[in-house]
UniProtKB/Swiss-Prot annotation:
Quaternary organization: The active form seems to be an ADP-bound monomer. Forms the RIDA complex (regulatory inactivation of DnaA) of ATP-DnaA, ADP-Hda and the DNA-loaded beta sliding clamp (dnaN).
Domain of life: Bacteria
Gene Ontology terms describing biological process: DNA replication initiation; negative regulation of DNA-templated DNA replication initiation
InterPro entries in the cross-refs: Chromosome_initiator_DnaA-like (IPR020591), DnaA_dom (IPR013317), Hda (IPR017788), Hda_Enterobact (IPR022864), Hda_lid (IPR055199), P-loop_NTPase (IPR027417)
Protein name according to UniProt: DnaA regulatory inactivator Hda
Keywords, alphabetical: DNA replication, DNA replication inhibitor
The species this protein was found in: Salmonella paratyphi A (strain AKU_12601)
Reported function: Mediates the interaction of DNA replication initiator protein DnaA with DNA polymerase subunit beta sliding clamp (dnaN). Stimulates hydrolysis of ATP-DnaA to ADP-DnaA, rendering DnaA inactive for reinitiation, a process called regulatory inhibition of DnaA or RIDA.
Family statement: Belongs to the DnaA family. HdA subfamily.
Length: 241
């Protein structure tokens, strides 16, 4: 399942950036672990009526995109215009798609490390940042795989801008937190993940959360199809472990 976010901008080129975002990646489905202060800061920025900026960094798969999707979901459900720009998919669009985004309530730029060294993209992001500062109304959330000063950007002024606001590292989940996150995801999908099965998954699989969630979805589907509860023998059978 997913919700549709479309950003139609009043620019000379009338650029449109339509995207499907997963509707199961919300704040309610995010297990914070040691990231309670980060979660509170994000929600505070979304509640305020004026502009705010947060830079969030973590390794791939830690949940940074989940948080941006959650922010988009929260504001779009309030009827606010939002924009989500996944720079790991930058071949889908051009830097000019950022033109006019300072008129939105929220702009989320994901995976900024993907355009480090790209002069056109760096300048487009720098210009958007400055326009957002001038407007004083748009919330800006940016994610990367490292702190701003370590991004190897070709435009020093952009690195300086990114370093201005609140900067948070998304802390990795402990194994206990990963178990809680899996059980939360299962409950939200309408089934229970027994503790022994969850610990078995953590022991036998790649512990990267994206992989674990995909496996959980696979097991949910298999359980429904076979009309069997999740047990370790059943999981071994389905995953061929």
């Amino acid at each position: 399942m997913s919700f549709w976010v479309e950003v139609s901008l009043n620019t000379p080129a009338q650029l449109s950036l339509p995207l499907y975002l997963p509707d199961d990646e919300t704040f309610a489905s995010f297990w914070p672990g040691d990231n309670a202060s980060l979660l509170a800061a994000l929600q505070n920025v979304l509640r305020q009526e004026h502009s705010g900026y947060i830079y969030l960094w973590a390794r791939e798969g830690a949940g940074r995109s989940h948080l941006l999707h959650a922010a988009c979901a929260e504001l779009s459900q309030r009827g606010d215009a939002v924009g989500y720009v996944p720079l790991d998919k930058r071949t889908w669009f051009v830097p000019e798609v950022l033109d006019g985004m300072e008129h939105l309530s929220l702009v989320c730029i994901d995976n900024i490390e993907c355009v480090a060294g790209d002069e056109l993209w760096e300048m487009a992001i720098f210009d958007l940042y400055n326009r957002i500062l001038e407007s004083g109304k748009t919330r800006l959330l940016i994610t990367g795989d490292r702190p701003p000063r370590q991004l190897n950007l070709g435009l020093p002024d952009l690195a300086s801008r990114l370093d201005w606001g609140q900067i948070y590292k998304l802390q990795p989940l402990s194994d206990e937190d990963k178990l809680q996150a899996l059980q939360l995801r299962a409950r939200l999908r309408g089934f229970e993940l027994p503790e022994d099965v969850g610990r078995f998954l953590l022991k036998r699989l790649d512990r990267e959360m994206r992989t674990l969630f995909m496996t959980l979805d696979q097991l949910d589907h298999a359980s429904i199809t076979a009309q069997r509860k999740l047990t370790i023998p059943f999981v071994k059978e389905i995953l061929k472990l």
